[in-house]
Amino acid sequence: VRRHLDRAEEGSLAARIARTTDPDGAVAPEDQIGHWLFAWDPGAAVTLRALALVATHPDVRGRARREMAAAPAGGPPELPVLRASVLESTRLWPTTPLLLRESTADTSWVGGELAAGTSLLVPTWFLHRDDRRRADADRLDVDQWLDGSAAEDWMLTPFSGGHGACPGRELVLFVASTVLATLLEDHHAVLLPPESFDAEAQLPRGLNPYALRFGLSRAAA
């Protein structure tokens, strides 16, 4: 990996990584490559699922097109609706179904006491889709990511949180929303069978991103 970085093409991502140094000297760029490549697979999954959501929800698609049209030229556009769509795809279908945590203090539960230092598995699929707590558990709600309400809901952990938060959160949101904007700027996307859902129906509890099929046609000018 080090040899590949040393001969990386100028202007490439590999060249940028090779020139990036850790101020403390504790992290070598070549040691990060495998981790980032391994961790990028969920980035593709959330992008495909978000495209399925936007393709099947005309209101969100229209809002996304309007924000793309209003984006100033000359730099990366702000795409809040598309970013929110990506975040909502991670709420509906978390790429990490279980989070591993450790309790920091003795805790009293209905069934007994939990000692500090106990390992816990947090089921994100259950927390994100708890229909006893939220009426819209199985429906698309991008606005909760725009008005700040999702950030205040500690049960929503699309990119984990605390010291274990995903360091690639902003990179995934940027790349995924940019890919969606590029696809939707000049094209109309339609979700094709075998998957089928729409804005009026409850969204499925499971969605295999690599089984999704889309039809693309040129959007009207």
Predicted regions and their residues:
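Cytochrome P450
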Residues: 1-221
